[in-house]
Amino acid sequence: MKLLVIGNGGREHALAWKLAQSPKVETVFVAPGNAGTAIEPKLQNIDLTAHQDLIEFCRKENIVFTVVGPEAPLAAGVVDDFRAAGLKIFGPTQYAAQLESSKDFAKAFMAKYNIPTAQYQTFENADAAHDYVNQKGAPIVIKADGLAAGKGVIVAMTLDEAHAAIDDMLLDNKMGNAGARVVIEDFLQGEEASFIVMVDGNNVLPMATSQDHKRLLDGDKGLNTGGMGAYSPAPVVTPVVYERAMNEIILPTVAGMKAEGHEFTGFLYAGLMIDQSGAPYTIEFNCRFGDPETQPIMSRLNSDLSDLVEAAIDGKLDSVTAEWSPQTAVGVVLAAQNYPETPKKGDVISGLDAANQVGKVFHAGTTANEKGDVLTNGGRVLCVVGLGDNVVQAKAKAYGALEKISFDGMQYRKDIADKAINR
């Protein structure tokens, strides 16, 4: 069968790569894809992004189903458009995707359905926001309401930082429409984890646990990014935390969306903060697989992903199980110079073949020129995954592969997975 994956990042490379491993799959088309998906066996890039063009392509090629990678097409209603055209697609509707595309929508939804999260208020008026912050004190968290590519969250450790973030979003329009409203919420202490599940509207199939590293620099310092690395499984998610996350967060969310008359289908990602007592709180929802979490998680999936997605689209997730490798996977992101602010593009990347002999290199912000050179073409350029019998071995494999790669201004964290190693 022929499948389609929408997107051009590392997450989409990993999803398409895993789908293509199925003996039932002939070709996975990636729209628009990157330099990695262009050369991966059984994958083929297509230069289409408009919904109607993609729908016509699916009809012409008899695509069995489509998987949506990034948040922007979901927020733009790609699932609604495909369903209206009678095509099978895995992802949430535009309404359901508001769990990610509007922080205010998500917080109000969590309050309504008693899903544990930080206390919050939403503001469009800067003066009112400044007053609220003065009343609450720091540390405090300022979030752009809309989609900001993972960079719309400011964890303000001082009042000055909080006031500056409010001005940036509400007065200086630094985030555009995404920051025209801000959600201000209490700062939660604890350890973060990514809890990702597949949902068919009613049933839930959990994916392997993982932990992302949002900050640019070692020791969780520097600016927030889309994610600088991840590992799976995440030992912070103990069996007890796992049960609590399912029963207190995931299942009430799925039931709540159904009660709202908008069944949730697709990948649902709860960004968790686990406090000292082991209680999970929801920091955010994403309505798609995480990036870079997808890369290590897919590296551990032994099941046929196409079977899981088909079951989810058909509302039969309760009839399948996901089998996972007992190994640990560590993925480290290589980012471009000046990421996350003004990443430099067009630098030649060398050492990819050598790195793939050691680990697995997933491409994100890459493109190829006429000569066949692979060039940087975005902020997060590559994600290098290593597998090992334990987290120490997996980390060594990932960094061993990464050392083969070079491009001008390449930056990466050296402490990915250290939280698991030091537990």
Predicted regions and their residues:
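Active-site "cap" helix and flanking loop/linker of ATP-utilizing ligase/carboxylase catalytic domains
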Residues: 246-268, 286-358, 369
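A conserved helix-loop-beta module that forms one wall/lid of the active-site cleft
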Residues: 90-152
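Generic C-terminus detector
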Residues: 366-371, 375-423
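Short acidic-hydrophobic, aromatic-tinged amphipathic segments that line or gate anion-handling sites
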Residues: 44-50, 121-125, 156
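Internal nucleotide-binding/catalytic subdomain
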Residues: 152, 156-294
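Solvent-exposed alpha-helices and their adjacent loops that cap or buttress functional pockets
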Residues: 21, 38-39, 90, 112-114, ...
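ATP-binding N-terminal substructure of ATP-dependent carboxylate-amine bond-forming enzymes
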Residues: 1-94
